[in-house]
Design a protein with these regions (language model features):
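ATP-dependent carboxylate-amine ligase
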Residues: 1-124
Length: 124
């Protein structure tokens, strides 16, 4: 919440676009609803699949749980299971003045450098 609150202040009149990569299957299972509630502070949310780190997958646990929680709390969310597709998806959705922020403990921070070249030939 604090990070998105700060992003909101920095964005001014622009939208806050949050890209969230859940970290660990157990945390995603246990805290999906709380993550979803907090992420509604962003104007638009993009959720990727779970960064597993040391954990094995848990049946039925994916980033879709967080995506569904964002929606259930009244937010706007897009589930992008394949993180490699996220820069292209974002390039088609961001607008001039948007602040795009990546959140997560995995490799989600790699998205920014991949997104920038896609935006160079647009107005975003």
């Amino acid at each position: 919440r604090a990070t998105l609150g700060a992003a909101r202040r920095v964005a001014g009149q622009g939208r806050v676009v949050a890209c969230f990569q859940p970290h660990l299957f157990t945390r995603t299972r246990d805290f999906a609803d709380g993550f979803g509630a907090a992420l509604t502070l962003a104007d638009e949310v993009f959720v990727t699949d779970v960064y597993p780190a040391r954990e094995e997958p848990i049946a039925g646990v994916s980033g879709r749980l967080v995506h569904d929680a964002v929606l259930s709390h009244g937010g706007s969310s897009c589930y992008v299971a394949d993180k490699a597709m996220l820069p292209e998806v974002l390039a088609g959705r961001v607008r001039p003045g948007d602040l795009v922020i990546t959140l997560g403990a995995g490799d989600i921070s790699l998205i920014g450098p991949l997104l920038l070249p896609l935006l160079q030939d647009t107005d975003a």
